[in-house]
Amino acid sequence: MKKIITTGVLFASLILFTTQQTKAQTLTAEDIKAQMVKEWERSKAYTIDYLNTMPANKYSFKPQDSIRSFAQQMLHLAQANLFFLSLATDLVSPSFGSDREKSPSAQTKDSVMYYVTASYDYCINAVKNSDISKWGEKKKLPFGGYEETRFALLLKAIEHQAHHRGQTTIYIRLQGIKPPQERLF
């Protein structure tokens, strides 16, 4: 009899626990939007760590002649942030001009810091002010014939900036400097 009661109590506890877990795992559209904002804020802080770690006199460093310098990588990241988020949200982005990464005057540490932080500020505000009910709509990219949802474009933007920030890890290491500690949260 004691075994039956114990089994019953355990079974009831399992049902109660499962029910509570199901309730706790429900995400609203606003939860998803808030998480996306949090991700952009984290990415901004992490990228600023990278910008601060590389010495100002090494922003022009290229591991090889055929690839972008550290400054060019970061300026490319900034321009792509604006491109993806303006396409995903239809919110007008600041104009950095085309090919900012090729402009020598933009490649100083102060200029790169300005453009990169401005791009992240735009991304954070674009997500905050976007209409999440439209995130499922398809958008045609102006190249390659690609068509993606607005939400997919937001995810591609996160992936793209992480990719280019990650590429600069080796630039920092080749200067004999330890790169910033990863910021997962």
Name every feature range the model reports, one short phrase each:
Residues 29-30, 36-38, 87, 106, ...:
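Short leucine-rich amphipathic alpha-helices used at interfaces
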Residues 104-141, 148-160:
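Acidic/histidine-rich alpha-helical segments that form the ligand environment
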Residues 37-41, 48, 58-101, 139-185:
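Short, contiguous alpha-helical
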Residues 23-45:
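Short N-terminal segments immediately surrounding and downstream of signal-peptide cleavage
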Residues 1-27:
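Bacterial Sec-dependent N-terminal signal peptides
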Residues 46, 50-51, 85, 122, ...:
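Well-ordered alpha-helical scaffold segments within catalytic/enzyme domains
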